[in-house]
């Protein structure tokens, strides 16, 4: 990702995709920043994954997280200007992968301690970060800060 900066200082604010200025510490910025963290953790998982299919699935999920982050970084009134959005097809594809993977690997019924492999630990890290992002997004919906998800 190319870094963009103006060298003028931002006084603690950032721009949404439509240009609206919001605090960097605001709940919307926290939500899409959390998705960025999740994508980075999944990037580590992808880089250390042995199977090409695993790398393909993780990359696709990372791209979906970028779409979701873009939706979170867009004010509802600006959403019609952009074509990106997650659809039921994205969710269906994810559910299909889950079913396929569960058919290959039996899930344990008890809690697990992450860390058997670097890739597995990175996936667990990404999973927990995504769950945090979900909680933040639900808060945005409940506060009526977002409506385009």
Show the residue positions of the predicted features.
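Phosphate/pyrophosphate-binding loop motifs in nucleotide- or prenyl diphosphate-using proteins
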Residues: 1-149
């Amino acid at each position: 990702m190319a870094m963009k900066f103006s060298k003028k200082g931002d006084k603690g604010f950032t721009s949404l995709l439509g240009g609206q200025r919001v605090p960097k510490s605001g709940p919307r910025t926290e939500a899409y920043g959390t998705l960025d963290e999740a994508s980075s953790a999944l990037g580590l998982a992808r880089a250390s994954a042995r199977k090409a299919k695993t790398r393909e699935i993780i990359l696709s999920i990372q791209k979906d997280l970028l779409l979701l982050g873009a939706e979170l970084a867009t004010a509802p009134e600006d959403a019609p200007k952009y074509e990106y959005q997650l659809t039921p097809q994205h969710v269906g594809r994810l559910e299909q992968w889950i079913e396929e993977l569960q058919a290959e690997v039996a899930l344990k019924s008890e809690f697990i301690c992450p860390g058997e492999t670097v890739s597995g630990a990175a996936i667990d890290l990404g999973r927990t970060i995504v769950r945090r992002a979900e909680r933040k997004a639900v808060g945005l919906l409940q506060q009526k800060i977002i409506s385009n998800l």
